[in-house]
Amino acid sequence: MKNLLSISDLTPNEILSIMDEADRFAEALKGREVKKLPTLRGRTVFTMFYENSTRTRASFETAGKWMSADVINISASSSSVKKGESLRDTALTLKSIGADALVMRHPSSGAAQHVANFIGDTAVINAGDGSNQHPTQALLDATTLRRQRGDLSGQHVVIVGDILHSRVARSNAQLLNALGADVTFVAPPTLLPIGVENWGVRVSHDLDAELPSADAVMMLRVQAERMNGGFFPSHREYATRYGLSKARHAMLKPDAVVMHPGPMLRGMEINYSVADAPNTVVLQQVTAGVHVRMAILFQLLIGGHSASETETDA
């Protein structure tokens, strides 16, 4: 694996390899007072974020630093991008400085692929490109779900909300299908993309009908920043029809889990108390995100050996 641009680039075995590696890193860090491994000592990772981020950016930085890499953050608002520098020139500048990996988030779909086409031997990791792909989010979601419920084959995962603008929904649908899960999208017709029937998922507009059979429910934020028109009458009506209320939460099986990629809009797509319920695994997703991103950096920059084979005390 040279880059990580899309879930569709990975085979099921490669997906499972990353998830297994993430679990090995979690085990390697368990009980350590100082969370530091020498795995990527001497490697340099640049994060290039052209959109705001909390979880993805912080967990990539943590992942790199816990493996002793030098991690340098570049934000569009404080770089030469503000002076008109192109994405190509910025990426080539960082490569010339000595980047071993570029972690990219960009509002344009295909931006990470564009950089990968000319950057040579520097690894490119897509941390979200427009409404196209968010492969590391799908990998951490699957890792979290497997830790909670075991093998994903046959699990019914219901993904609810703004599917149209969601790179998370696209990446999760591809990954979950690859691992044999059954995926249902629930959304108003205005928030479903054209051609969604070809994604290998079921589509429903009735959340109440899907909840009783769900093994996991993933709530998505309405991405108002990507909307230019009225996709639903009001926030109140959206929450009434598609929000995970306390009453709807009670419809779930006892062992079902509630997920959210964040940031959550409490009171919109998820009830305040449901967001903090015992079976809501949002914080477990964040924790898994660090382990998964460690695994990805490791496989791209080292490869060929498992974390357990390369681990020594720092």
UniProtKB/Swiss-Prot annotation:
Reactions catalysed according to its record: carbamoyl phosphate + L-aspartate = N-carbamoyl-L-aspartate + phosphate + H(+)
GO molecular function term, any single one: aspartate carbamoyltransferase activity
Residue sites binding carbamoyl phosphate per the record: R55, T56, R105, H134, Q137, G262, P263
GO cellular component: cytosol
Binding site for L-aspartate: K83, R167, R221
Keywords recorded for this protein, A-Z: Pyrimidine biosynthesis, Transferase
Enzyme class: transferase
Keyword Metal-binding appears in the UniProt entry: no
Listed InterPro entries: Asp/Orn_carbamoyltranf_P-bd, Asp/Orn_carbamoylTrfase, Asp/Orn_carbamoylTrfase_sf, Asp_carbamoyltransf, Asp_carbamoyltransf_Asp/Orn-bd
Coiled coil segments of this chain: none
One record GO biological process: 'de novo' pyrimidine nucleobase biosynthetic process
Pfam families: OTCace, OTCace_N
Domain of life of the source: Bacteria
Pathway membership: Pyrimidine metabolism; UMP biosynthesis via de novo pathway; (S)-dihydroorotate from bicarbonate: step 2/3
Gene3D superfamilies, per the entry: Aspartate/ornithine carbamoyltransferase
Annotated EC: 2.1.3.2
Function: Catalyzes the condensation of carbamoyl phosphate and aspartate to form carbamoyl aspartate and inorganic phosphate, the committed step in the de novo pyrimidine nucleotide biosynthesis pathway.
SUBUNIT field: Heterododecamer (2C3:3R2) of six catalytic PyrB chains organized as two trimers (C3), and six regulatory PyrI chains organized as three dimers (R2).
HAMAP family tied to this protein: Asp_carb_tr
Annotated NCBIfam families: asp_carb_tr, PRK00856.1
Protein family (similarity comment): Belongs to the aspartate/ornithine carbamoyltransferase superfamily. ATCase family.
Protein known as: Aspartate carbamoyltransferase catalytic subunit
Source organism of this protein record: Corynebacterium urealyticum (strain ATCC 43042 / DSM 7109)
